[in-house]
Amino acid sequence: KVSLQELLSTPNNKSLLKRLGRENILSSKSEPGTQAIFFASAKSKPELFYLLWFYKDEAAYKKHVASANYKKFTSASAEILASKKAISLKKRATFSKNLTPERLKDAYFHITNLSLLAKSDAKFEKLVKKYMQKSVDEGAYAQFAFSQKDAPNKWVLVEIYKDEASFESYRHSENYKAYAKERAGLIDEFDGFGLKNETSFSKVKF
C-alpha cells in the first residue's frame, strides 16, 4: 500500500510544516506496518512538499491514519496549508539499495509526473522495470514508479540519488539515453523537478 500527498504551505510556514512533518515521521517509524516515509520539498518552490508513504498492507495504512500522532499532524498542519492533494497510487515498480539514514539525509529526489499515450501502459511498465533496475545497479539509491489509481495513463516516478551531480551524471549515461529513446513513443507529456530531502526513513529494501 502506498500513499502520496502534495502539500503547499502558506508562505511563512515552511519551517513549521517541516517540523510537524518530522515529528509525525519519527513517531511513525516505530509502527511495525509502516515500511518507509519520504518527505521532501521542491527545490524551485520551497513551500511545495511531497509526502510518500509505504505500508505493509491496507491494515497498516488504516492503523497509521488512525494513530494519535497522524491525527495531530493533520490537524496542526491544516491551519498552515494553502492546499493539500492526496494522490491515490498503484505501485508498478520499486527498486532500492541501502536506504540508510546517512545516505538519505542529504539525498537528492527527483519527481516526474507523466501522461502516457493510449494503450501504452503495459509497454511502459516493462520499460521502466528494465531500466530502473539497471539505474539502481549503477548508483541511484532508489527508483519508484506508480500509476494513478483513478487515471492509469498518468504515472508518477520518484528517483533518489546521492546528490544532484549524481542525478545529472545518470542523465548522461547510456542506460538513461536508451530509456529516453524507447519511452519517446509512449509518452504524451511529462514534467519533472528536483526535491530536497527533509525527513525520510526506510526499513525495507524495495
Describe each model-derived feature in a short phrase.
Residues K1-F49, K56-A66, K71, A78-F206:
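Short S/T/G/P-rich N-terminal loop/turn motif that feeds into the first structured element of a domain
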